[in-house]
Amino acid sequence: MDLLLAIVLIVLAFLGGALGGMYLVRKQIEKEFADNPRLNAEAVRTLLSANGQKPSEAKVQQVYHQIIRQQKAALANNKKKK
């Protein structure tokens, strides 16, 4: 009986550690993306230029801030669902 209990406890500890680790990694990645977005103003400028537009700095900043607001809203909306 002691061997069975030890095996069950080892399996439960392993599963708990795996789930806890996945949770912590997910939170860390979300924080990293919130602090350092993958898209910057230079990428927006390149994107607008690739579409045949000659982007002004005001247009670049407008599009960049719009994208950042959408990302923050999506992140907040995702947190509400949980």
UniProtKB/Swiss-Prot annotation:
**Where is it located?**
Cell membrane
Keywords in alphabetical order, please. Cell membrane, Membrane, Transmembrane, Transmembrane helix
Name this protein carries in UniProt? UPF0154 protein SPD_1662
Please report which protein family the annotation says this sequence is part of: Belongs to the UPF0154 family.
List the transmembrane segments: 5-25
Specify the domain of life of the species encoding this protein.
Answer: Bacteria
- Transmembrane found in the keyword field: yes
Q: Indicate how the chain sits in the lipid bilayer.
A: Single-pass membrane protein
